[in-house]
Each structure stands twice: as C-alpha cells, then as structure tokens.
C-alpha cells in the first residue's frame, strides 16, 4: 500500500477560517474519512483532495 496511507490521519483544524478540508485514510479502521488541516501548517502526507482519490490510493 501507499506510504501516504500509513501516515497519521488528519483530524481537523480548530480554527474554522484556517481550515483546508479533504480526505484522510485511517489505517486502524481501513476507511477514508473527511478531515481538515490548518493552512498555516504543512499539508499532512495523509491528505487526499477527494474520497475517490483516497480510496483508489489506499484501497479502502
């Protein structure tokens, strides 16, 4: 499986105006979840623009 899928899942940014939404893979559950990260931080490796991209990459 892809290294992107093994990264720590992104859980969300608490500051709403700073949030970038996307999808993340949770290897514990084997599923793609909707999540977000804070714009002022680096984009997490476990970030996908769409649910389809997440599923295709991680086989969820």
Swiss-Prot record:
Superkingdom, natural source: Eukaryota
GO cellular component, one term: extracellular region
GO MF entries: serine-type endopeptidase inhibitor activity; toxin activity
Major localization listed first in the record, in broad terms: secreted
Keyword Secreted attributed: yes
Chain location of the short sequence motif Cell attachment site per the record: 14-16
Keyword Secreted applies: yes
Protein function: Tick salivary platelet aggregation inhibitor that plays an important part in the anti-hemostatic strategy of ticks. Inhibits fibrinogen interaction with platelets. Acts by binding (in a divalent metal ion dependent manner) to the glycoprotein IIb-IIIa receptor (ITGA2B/ITGB3) on the platelet surface and inhibits aggregation induced by ADP (IC(50)=99-104 nM), thrombin, collagen (IC(50)=64 nM) platelet-activating factor and collagen. Interacts to unstimulated platelets (Kd=42.5 nM) and to ADP-stimulated platelets (Kd=39.4 nM).
Name of the protein in question: Disagregin
Organism: Ornithodoros moubata (Soft tick)
């Amino acid at each position: 499986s892809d290294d992107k899928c093994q990264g720590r899942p992104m859980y969300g940014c608490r500051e709403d105006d700073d949030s970038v939404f996307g999808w993340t893979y949770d290897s514990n559950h084997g599923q793609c979840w909707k999540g977000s990260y804070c714009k002022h931080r680096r984009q997490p490796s476990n970030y996908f623009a769409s649910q389809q991209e997440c599923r295709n990459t991680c086989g969820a």
